[in-house]
Amino acid sequence: MFPIVEFCVSNLAQGSQEAKEILEKDPNLDVVEYGCLSYCGQCMQTMYALVNGEMVTANNPAELVENIYKFIDENELI
């Protein structure tokens, strides 16, 4: 089973769309977009995604991609 990376549509509009597009090219990830992930406070402050239900944050799309892969490696999800 591949790691699931979940994005909130509101956070995508705030800049994490670029990270989502990069991650969607990885066949070893399941990337999903939802209308809301119920992290509104976090969503307004920073870019984030949930990786297998755990929040990963960053200040820009490139850092978000890097942090997601780091989280996956550290937790041996692939």
From Swiss-Prot:
Q: Which family does it belong to?
A: Belongs to the UPF0349 family.
Q: Which NCBIfam families match?
A: PRK13669.1 (NF010190)
Listed name of the protein: UPF0349 protein BLi03401/BL03152
Per the UniProt entry, what species is this protein from, by scientific name? Bacillus licheniformis (strain ATCC 14580 / DSM 13 / JCM 2505 / CCUG 7422 / NBRC 12200 / NCIMB 9375 / NCTC 10341 / NRRL NRS-1264 / Gibson 46)
Q: Which HAMAP family match?
A: UPF0349
Pfam family for this entry, one: DUF1450
Output the lineage of the source organism.
Bacteria, Bacillati, Bacillota, Bacilli, Bacillales
